[in-house]
Amino acid sequence: MKKILLLGSGELGKEFVISAQRKGQHIIACDSYAGAPAMQVADECEVFDMLNGEELERIVKKHRPDIIVPEIEAIRTERLYDFEKEGIQVVPSARAVNYTMNRKAIRDLAAKELGLKTAKYYYAKSLEELKEAAEKIGFPCVVKPLMSSSGKGQSLVKSAAELEHAWEYGCNGSRGDIRELIIEEFIKFDSEITLLTVTQKNGPTLFCPPIGHVQKGGDYRESFQPAHIDPAHLKEAEDMAEKVTRALTGAGLWGVEFFLSHENGVYFSELSPRPHDTGMVTLAGTQNLNEFELHLRAVLGLPIPGIKQERIGASAVILSPIASQERPQYRGMEEVTGEEDTYLRIFGKPYTRVNRRMGVVLCYAPNGSDLDALRDKAKRIADKVEVY
């Protein structure tokens, strides 16, 4: 049995804890607020500010974990290097967690060091630099903070008149006091995919069938598997994913995102060194092993006998229309649970924010079925669940 310190206790962490419990592991779930989803199923829990390096060190010394598993980005990640030097396994590695939290570090690694195809980009530390970069790239363009998550501070800028707002919005959405943005060429893509990639301690890099997804404001709204893409494009994406994960080092599951264009091929977008929100579709039984089980096996060094597509699946999120500190209630349960070949997952978050993700609907069908119809079904059913 390993003692695992989970940093971040959202819905993805909750599913990871469930997988770990089924393999007899001991989990300490941490977050900045009490009653977070993963805490509800963990052995122990801690509530503290994970951006506070001293507090993070105190918790690590208190519990002396064998493994630290970051589940979110709001962590004082540079401290992970110290823990790794002390002999604690950091998942997938301290280098990976630090690089992927900073868009500047990961973009320069991908584009300049590894030669992966990405959108054209510049950095801006002031509104004037942002205006200069936009003039070089042209409109529309995408402006993002260097450090943020779930689309915070991200905007699509269609004209020079919108740049001042994009600058303020980006800086306000940035983590900490960093006032530097990345400005990117807007890629006219035909689709987006997540390629769940598994790096192992004692085995080859493995890939899950590609997952298509739809985002709004930089945040996931629906996903489906398998995404139908050109085999040559898939091979190109797999090669890129293997190259970047190898450079970042470590064992675990990664969510590697790509833009696909019929005319221009595959563009690397970004990656997360942990289970991916779009990968929740694997909870519909689309694979023989879901993304959380794969992550756990890679972390523990357990064998993975191969990844197989078992059936097709689609997911659609349930969002809160309200903001309240009261425990949320849900309508529509009876109607939704009466649907065939459908799972409903309510995450158990103790309070709401407007557009906070509170649950997900998962639908499945045999291989060869109509995936578009399944996507429509998942969205239709998700709309029946009301958060109040």
UniProtKB/Swiss-Prot annotation:
<dbReference type="GO" id="GO:0005829">
    <property type="term" value="C:cytosol"/>
</dbReference>
<feature type="binding site">
    <location>
        <position position="277"/>
    </location>
    <ligand>
        <name>N(1)-(5-phospho-beta-D-ribosyl)glycinamide</name>
    </ligand>
</feature>
<dbReference type="InterPro" id="IPR048740">
    <property type="entry name" value="PurT_C"/>
</dbReference>
<protein>
    <recommendedName>
        <fullName>Formate-dependent phosphoribosylglycinamide formyltransferase</fullName>
        <ecNumber>6.3.1.21</ecNumber>
    </recommendedName>
</protein>
<dbReference type="GO" id="GO:0006189">
    <property type="term" value="P:'de novo' IMP biosynthetic process"/>
</dbReference>
<comment type="similarity">
    <text>Belongs to the PurK/PurT family.</text>
</comment>
<dbReference type="GO" id="GO:0000287">
    <property type="term" value="F:magnesium ion binding"/>
</dbReference>
<dbReference type="InterPro" id="IPR005862">
    <property type="entry name" value="PurT"/>
</dbReference>
<dbReference type="InterPro" id="IPR054350">
    <property type="entry name" value="PurT/PurK_preATP-grasp"/>
</dbReference>
<keyword id="KW-0067">ATP-binding</keyword>
<comment type="function">
    <text>Involved in the de novo purine biosynthesis. Catalyzes the transfer of formate to 5-phospho-ribosyl-glycinamide (GAR), producing 5-phospho-ribosyl-N-formylglycinamide (FGAR). Formate is provided by PurU via hydrolysis of 10-formyl-tetrahydrofolate.</text>
</comment>
<dbReference type="GO" id="GO:0005524">
    <property type="term" value="F:ATP binding"/>
</dbReference>
<feature type="domain" description="ATP-grasp">
    <location>
        <begin position="108"/>
        <end position="300"/>
    </location>
</feature>
<keyword id="KW-0658">Purine biosynthesis</keyword>
<feature type="binding site">
    <location>
        <position position="144"/>
    </location>
    <ligand>
        <name>ATP</name>
    </ligand>
</feature>
<keyword id="KW-0547">Nucleotide-binding</keyword>
<comment type="subunit">
    <text>Homodimer.</text>
</comment>
<feature type="binding site">
    <location>
        <begin position="356"/>
        <end position="357"/>
    </location>
    <ligand>
        <name>N(1)-(5-phospho-beta-D-ribosyl)glycinamide</name>
    </ligand>
</feature>
<keyword id="KW-0460">Magnesium</keyword>
<dbReference type="GO" id="GO:0043815">
    <property type="term" value="F:phosphoribosylglycinamide formyltransferase 2 activity"/>
</dbReference>
<dbReference type="InterPro" id="IPR003135">
    <property type="entry name" value="ATP-grasp_carboxylate-amine"/>
</dbReference>
<dbReference type="Pfam" id="PF22660">
    <property type="entry name" value="RS_preATP-grasp-like"/>
</dbReference>
<keyword id="KW-0479">Metal-binding</keyword>
<dbReference type="InterPro" id="IPR016185">
    <property type="entry name" value="PreATP-grasp_dom_sf"/>
</dbReference>
<feature type="binding site">
    <location>
        <position position="192"/>
    </location>
    <ligand>
        <name>ATP</name>
    </ligand>
</feature>
<feature type="binding site">
    <location>
        <begin position="184"/>
        <end position="187"/>
    </location>
    <ligand>
        <name>ATP</name>
    </ligand>
</feature>
<comment type="pathway">
    <text>Purine metabolism; IMP biosynthesis via de novo pathway; N(2)-formyl-N(1)-(5-phospho-D-ribosyl)glycinamide from N(1)-(5-phospho-D-ribosyl)glycinamide (formate route): step 1/1.</text>
</comment>
<feature type="binding site">
    <location>
        <begin position="11"/>
        <end position="12"/>
    </location>
    <ligand>
        <name>N(1)-(5-phospho-beta-D-ribosyl)glycinamide</name>
    </ligand>
</feature>
<feature type="binding site">
    <location>
        <position position="71"/>
    </location>
    <ligand>
        <name>N(1)-(5-phospho-beta-D-ribosyl)glycinamide</name>
    </ligand>
</feature>
<feature type="binding site">
    <location>
        <position position="349"/>
    </location>
    <ligand>
        <name>N(1)-(5-phospho-beta-D-ribosyl)glycinamide</name>
    </ligand>
</feature>
<feature type="binding site">
    <location>
        <position position="103"/>
    </location>
    <ligand>
        <name>ATP</name>
    </ligand>
</feature>
<keyword id="KW-0436">Ligase</keyword>
<dbReference type="Pfam" id="PF21244">
    <property type="entry name" value="PurT_C"/>
</dbReference>
<feature type="binding site">
    <location>
        <begin position="149"/>
        <end position="154"/>
    </location>
    <ligand>
        <name>ATP</name>
    </ligand>
</feature>
<feature type="binding site">
    <location>
        <position position="257"/>
    </location>
    <ligand>
        <name>Mg(2+)</name>
    </ligand>
</feature>
<dbReference type="InterPro" id="IPR011054">
    <property type="entry name" value="Rudment_hybrid_motif"/>
</dbReference>
<dbReference type="InterPro" id="IPR013815">
    <property type="entry name" value="ATP_grasp_subdomain_1"/>
</dbReference>
<feature type="binding site">
    <location>
        <position position="270"/>
    </location>
    <ligand>
        <name>Mg(2+)</name>
    </ligand>
</feature>
<dbReference type="Pfam" id="PF02222">
    <property type="entry name" value="ATP-grasp"/>
</dbReference>
<dbReference type="GO" id="GO:0004644">
    <property type="term" value="F:phosphoribosylglycinamide formyltransferase activity"/>
</dbReference>
<dbReference type="InterPro" id="IPR011761">
    <property type="entry name" value="ATP-grasp"/>
</dbReference>
